Amino acid sequence: MTFQNTREFAKQLDAQDALNHYQEQFIFPKVNDKRVIYFTGNSLGLQPKRTKAYIDEVMNDWAELAVEGHFYAEKPWWDYQERFSEPLSKIVGALPSEVTVMNTLTVNLHLLMVSFYQPKGKRYKIICEEKAFPSDQYMFQSQVHFHGYKPEDAIVEIKRREGEHNIRLEDVLAKIEEVGDELALVLIGGVNYYTGQVFDIKTITAAGQKAGAKVGWDLAHAAGNIKLELHDWNVDFAAWCSYKYMNSGPGNASGVFVHERHHNDPDLPRFAGWWGHNKERRFKMEPNFDPVHGAGGWQISNLPVLSLAPYLASVEMFAEVGMDALIAKRDHITSYLEFILHEIDKEVESTFEIITPSNPEERASQLSVFLHGEGRSLFDYLMKNGVITDWREPNVIRLAPVPLYCSYEDMYDFGQILKKGILGK
């Protein structure tokens, strides 16, 4: 399809978009009494209108049933998390038994590293990407310290080549081979938060395991955003947050994946708690831990149902839409946004550069735009004019055209506002 930078063409694309009506199912902030153009679903997704009803249901059950809500609520609280197994399994490409919800992202990665980072002898090193999200960096450093190693020795970062913004797959594979029998764990972000680069999870997982290491993934920017087949790709473990593309609300619960081949391994260590205990015997208060079969055996504490309610509202919407439809629109609307940016770049003196890969196979619902010069003032201009974007140091505006609530006309309007902002500087 040949794109056009006109409002009429954008409206035509919206009219043909099977997901366009979902935009009306979200609540948008307003600037100057006008609905914003929202590009920050990669930081915090918008609130679905249905969310309040899910929360109200829990609040009403709490008011009317109090403690009995654990067993007699409309959706009983004691097994509330099981409602996520089926929809989450489809979002991340897993068996229902391989996924659960609990805690928050970095907490879950720490807990999973208890099981899957077991340094021994000369096999103690961790491979991660250069400039991983800071929370991951702090996690790696603290885990390595805990086991008695020095981060500068035990943490191996895969570097970008000089003058390049993204990490080459061949460099990831070469680093895994180089570290070889010293490698204990590969843990990379499925989508890099800064550049929007999508990593080849299947190929990297196979390479890490061939080297004798466990392979896990931080899917904070991947879950609900890219096609995942965690079970078929033989991924050892993964975790993700739910408040970005999955629209569950600020700081909300995380999801975890543990491959089924690890479920019955008696030698695999884990930190345990009563919510990971055999569900049928949980309230018998027995002294010895008998883990729930599957990823649920990694749960520790009673789950925060009020937090899970908006998460459930979101995953049920995902089940309605389906990942294939989301990804099809994601690729198309991201390409249209890329086209708009290139058109603006032709019209004005070049002040920016898209650092996200141009290959649709290597990106998802994000374009990271590196701004030369006084980029922060352009970001501020966009915000004042109703375009909510995300600023990341150094000098990058991240744009996430989330397919559930962004329209093609939004892309056109953004381009016009961006052009005025650049020319007005």
Swiss-Prot record:
GO terms for biological process: anthranilate metabolic process; L-kynurenine catabolic process; L-tryptophan catabolic process to kynurenine; NAD biosynthetic process; quinolinate biosynthetic process. Pathway: Amino-acid degradation; L-kynurenine degradation; L-alanine and anthranilate from L-kynurenine: step 1/1; Cofactor biosynthesis; NAD(+) biosynthesis; quinolinate from L-kynurenine: step 2/3. GO terms for cellular component: cytoplasm. It comes from the Bacteria. This is Kynureninase. Homodimer. The keyword Isomerase does not apply.
